Amino acid sequence: MIRLHIIGLCASDVTKQTPRCGDAQIIDDGKNYEVIDGYCGKGANRLISALKKRKIYSPYLHITHAHYDHYYGIRAIIRDKTFSPKALYCYDPDSLRDVSKDVKDNKKALLNVINEAKARKIPVIYLKNGSIIEHGDINIVVYRNQPSKFSGNSDAYVNDGSLCYWFGNIGYLTTGDAGLDVAKRHKLFAKIIKIGHHGNNCVRVISRWLKDHGCKYCWDNDYSTSLTDFLMTGREDALAVGMTYFSVHGDINAIFRDGKAIIYKNGKAYSYLCDYVGKNTLNAATPYICRKVLRGSYGKADVRTTNLLNLGYSPTSIQNKINQIVEIATGIKDGKLDYGKNKARLQRIDAELGKGYGQLVQDYINVLFGVREKV
């Protein structure tokens, strides 16, 4: 099984002083852990916390491009002796050939991180267009189209040269801050995409091409605040052509197994078919875990989903188990219960989950993870 964990933020994480926070992703097959970019500011702290909570101490680190808001968390991992990274993947800073001050500063800052990694004897591997990374079930083809000329906008010059990672067996394309034209250029028929540069690097014509070729879902690191200086057009274009959009207000989680992907976001589940056939390694629901979920032990919505996946449980299995218990005990499916009128039947829920849970299920019925979309 492969899991994708996109670290989310909350509104308080983004301040007027630090509106640019980048993004961070953890993708793993249970043995190999890839950390792609690392936020800055509070986002970097959230990434470090997530890694330690999951006891991921030897990840592969990736920097998609030379903008600090995407790699300060990576630098923090390198500096933290708790971690022993297996390697650092990035591009050669010398591939940024422009001589403007901004680009020179970007190169110097990235080189400093690379030197810190080398000082800790972490292997540094430079990637280029066509590079391949294979770690267990994780297969990545790298695409890069660094502009040869400086257009007068240093951000655009560096963004457009981001490393784009194509996870073909799960249908996932993440682009750093590059434009999504990489998908059309290389015929990458993604099912879910990460829109680059806070949403403004995906033009309508590319969104339409992606949707026409099976792309159903997208996300970006637009925090939807008035504090950012960027025009958020990617989200609007993706929505306009019929994609489902996920924000990073809260975590985004996805699991891939048995030829199927399930994405968890905002208390709901979404799905699509994929080529990856790795077996499911999540635990099925038990009365014990159902009781704890109903009592709110793992939080709500995206927090709950992350916590359950961290513990190795399937959120969908838990939802289905609770729905099944309710339906068997009451004969009512997807409906509200009247505890007084259904007391005898609800006692059967108590017998399954423990005394007092009939009333709790009544109050909480069918609002845990939403209705799973059928493939």
State the predicted function of each range.
Residues 30-34, 42-90, 185-200, 212-214:
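Active-site metal-binding motif and surrounding structural segment of the metallo-beta-lactamase
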Residues 309-330, 352-375:
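Repeat-associated, polar segments at repeat-unit boundaries in modular proteins
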Residues 87, 95-141, 146-147, 155-159, ...:
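Binuclear metal-ion centers of metallo-dependent hydrolases, dominated by the metallo-beta-lactamase
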Residues 34-37, 59-63, 86-91, 126, ...:
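Structural recognition of the beta-strand scaffold that forms the well-ordered cores
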